[in-house]
Amino acid sequence: MVMNVYRQIDRSDLQFDFLLKEKVDDGYEQEVKALGGHIFYVESPKKIGVKNYIKNVKAVIEQNGPYCAVHSHMNVMSGLIMFSAWLSGINLRISHSHSTRFTNSFPTIILGKTLIKIFANKKVACGQKAGKALFGQSKFSVIPNGIDTAKYYVYDENTRSILRRKLNMKLDAFQICHVGRFVDVKNHKFILEVARELKNDNVNFQVHLLGDGELFDEIHQMANEMNLEEVCFHGSVENVNEYLKASDLFILPSKYEGLPVTLVEAQSAGVKCLVSNGVPTEADFNLGLMEALPLEKDIWVTRIKQCVSNKKRIAQSDIESAIRNRGYDIKESANKMLEVYL
């Protein structure tokens, strides 16, 4: 979401620098540098302790500024960033919520929320539920996770076939796509269990897993042990839009979510989306593309098999109208974000 906004803004008036806790792909580093920004790294509080983390964040801010604002997207952990920014004399301190639940320990959640309440002077969320989860009754602004909609439109089936050849997808197979980091909340083990049942039922399919993360190797090994050659691991890719446009189905069986931008992207591509009950309904375009299911394997297997035999396309004009009406166009999101900084 941040990169989408960064690409849209007038960078002669406003520049972004990025502070991360782990290495990103070289492609992103090169793009940020080309756009005039910088990327800095600070190890997580879990690795170096809270005191050292605050000290290091403060040092990055003070040694590379001056900055007009610090904008944190770390959910509960934004509290430490807000405190560090306050110590560094930053006048505008923005906490941004992207999730409806948090996996941190109870003391960490209490500390983070308290620091945000005291030291963040602007609060933003991707949706109402995500905002209430982090900020409670405090006032916050909602800015949808906008996308560059033109990248996701599919005008004809010939385009889809061309993309499948380019991406080495089987032309005759039902193509399923998932986008997300390999972390517990994304529920990749559930995806493998569903894939095994589809294979046992002789369904002609492929599953494409896009993303990386701490559980990547473990999930990859599990797929090998389950002989799931139908499951393809692509790592982090820059052409997510092409995989979505080439797919028949997008799945998101997360244990919980904020308002996932990948779900917005998938609907923008006109792809049927099966999601868990942990995904907020406000992510639905109301075009019949999104369907929420309980996290029960048999239900998912049955529903996917039904999707295989009943492929339905939504008119592009209806998709475009839904995107505009819900404020998911990146230009509108970028403008709203700029208003936060002013």
Predicted feature locations:
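Aromatic "clamp/platform" in nucleotide-sugar-dependent glycosyltransferases that forms part
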Residues: 236, 255
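Acidic anion/phosphate-binding donor-loop and adjacent secondary structure
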Residues: 46-52, 132-137, 146-166, 171-172
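Short hydrophobic beta-strand element within catalytic cores of glycosyltransferases
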Residues: 19-20, 263, 272-276, 282
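Nucleotide-activated donor-binding/catalytic signature segment of Leloir-type glycosyltransferases, i.e.
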Residues: 220-235
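N-terminal strand-loop element at the rim of the active site
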Residues: 4-55, 214-215, 340
